[in-house]
């Protein structure tokens, strides 16, 4: 079942009727920042950044590798490297470690620093390693596929290799993300397509949206309570 059929079925059974107004439309999805990504676990890193800009268009996911080492470096380590370059912090939005752990990099809704001339409309994923000489682990490929599917779900992109998912070398004159990873990206994106159309991912997406709606309603209720309290206080005789 693909994503469109799944959402249509949810609407028919009544779930979508309650939640669908909280799904962003195609234009809104380009800048929408969810409370969580569906179907993947992101390890927080609590990094401190310099000044960042919001990204208002998202139409492509760009894949990178570390390149200068095949070591299992962390987002915190890359953050220090990029700070040393005079940047605001790590330029990638996500890192995929050797064991498949996905680490948080630059905040997802901000402009990255990972692909020259194309940062304002792209999300950057770094799969850790030097893939000119080595190959990615199975855990990395699996996590990258699920992360791509989750991002495509949020930004309403169809995961298509060479269109909405590309390698760094497709934009700039570079070997990144390495010949061995680049050769495997079509297969990784195909796995992402399968997961993208799964009931599992879309059910999780609905759960997150429902949670966001409940939190928004709670915030509105708290705001109404504060406003009423202020009005009552101001309306009392001195």
Can you say where each PLM-predicted feature lies in the sequence?
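Basic/polar, cationic surfaces and motifs that engage anionic cell-wall
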Residues: 2, 8-11, 19-22, 26-58, ...
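Conserved beta-strand segments that form the floor/walls of ligand-binding pockets within enzyme
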Residues: 95, 124-126
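Short, conserved "active-site rim" segments that organize catalytic pockets and cofactor/ligand binding
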Residues: 47-108
């Amino acid at each position: 079942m693909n994503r469109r059929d799944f959402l249509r079925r949810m609407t028919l059974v009544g779930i979508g009727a309650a939640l669908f107004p909280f799904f962003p439309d195609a234009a809104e999805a380009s800048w929408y920042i969810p409370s969580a990504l569906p179907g993947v676990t992101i390890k927080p890193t609590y990094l401190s950044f310099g000044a960042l800009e919001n990204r208002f268009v998202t139409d492509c996911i760009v894949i990178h590798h570390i390149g200068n080492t095949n070591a299992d470096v962390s987002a915190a380590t890359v953050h220090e490297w990029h700070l040393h370059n005079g940047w605001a912090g790590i330029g990638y939005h996500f890192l995929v470690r050797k064991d498949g752990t996905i680490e948080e990099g630059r905040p997802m809704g901000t402009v990255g620093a990972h692909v020259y001339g194309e940062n304002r409309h792209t999300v950057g994923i770094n799969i850790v390693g030097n893939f000119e000489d080595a190959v990615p682990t199975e855990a990395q490929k699996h996590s990258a596929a699920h992360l791509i599917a989750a991002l495509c779900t949020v930004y309403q992109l169809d995961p298509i290799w060479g269109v909405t998912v590309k390698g760094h070398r497709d934009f700039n004159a570079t070997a990144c993300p390495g010949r061995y990873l680049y050769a495997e990206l079509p297969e990784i994106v195909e796995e992402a397509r399968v997961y993208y159309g799964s009931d599992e991912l879309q059910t999780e997406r609905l759960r997150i949206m429902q949670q966001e709606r409940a939190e928004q309603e709670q915030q509105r209720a708290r705001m109404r309570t504060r406003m009423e309290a202020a009005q009552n206080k101001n309306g009392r005789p001195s």
